[in-house]
């Protein structure tokens, strides 16, 4: 018989999402645990988010309440201070969160130069791409079609800059995925059960 957390194939089942927000850095001070969407962290009594511990994820956090503003992807791991979950270093504000649904082992994404899925395109299947330029794609990214899997796009190569969560579906222009400009230069898959010791995704050098 399979155990509680094992499927018949022996693969671990996804755990219920769980994230703990601390008011101070290094997991100090008042804390609040979430297992579902939180449109406004302040309504839980938290003045600010100084550090984050993801026990089961992944999650996406937002700079503003009601899932607006800059996005931050959190995978299972420790985030001892705000600059461990953002490399854009534009804001230390974290005001709302929700779990990310990861329901596909397959990953396929198509990025288009122009809005409405026109112009030059780049198709990526089951791979992480730290630099579009290295793959010969030097165009802007104005629209995106995610056919399977869940992805995160980054403003700059090497998984740096602003982050854009790309879930299954069509994004007709860059504002649909939260980008102020049609600039995405690296992309990676979000896979459940990943563990990042240092929190934010750090590619191996």
Swiss-Prot record:
Disulfide cysteine pairs (residue numbers): none
Chain intervals for the UniProt region annotation (N-terminal arm): 2-16
InterPro entries: Beta/Gamma-Crystallin (IPR050252), Beta/gamma_crystallin (IPR001064), G_crystallin-like (IPR011024)
SMART domains assigned to the protein according to its UniProt record, in alphabetical order: XTALbg (SM00247)
A Pfam family reported for this protein in Swiss-Prot or TrEMBL: Crystall
Annotated spans, C-terminal arm: 193-205
Domain Beta/gamma crystallin 'Greek key' span(s) in chain numbering: 17-56, 57-101, 107-148, 149-191
Chain residue ranges for the region called Connecting peptide: 102-106
Gene Ontology BP annotations: camera-type eye development; lens development in camera-type eye; visual perception
Modified-residue entries (N-acetylalanine), positions: 2
SUPFAM superfamilies in UniProt: gamma-Crystallin-like
UniProt keyword annotations, A-Z: Acetylation, Eye lens protein, Repeat
Gene Ontology terms, MF aspect: identical protein binding; structural constituent of eye lens
Oligomer and partners: Homo/heterodimer, or complexes of higher-order. The structure of beta-crystallin oligomers seems to be stabilized through interactions between the N-terminal arms.
Domain notes: Has a two-domain beta-structure, folded into four very similar Greek key motifs.
Family: Belongs to the beta/gamma-crystallin family.
Official protein name in the record: Beta-crystallin B2
Organism whose genome encodes this protein: Rattus norvegicus
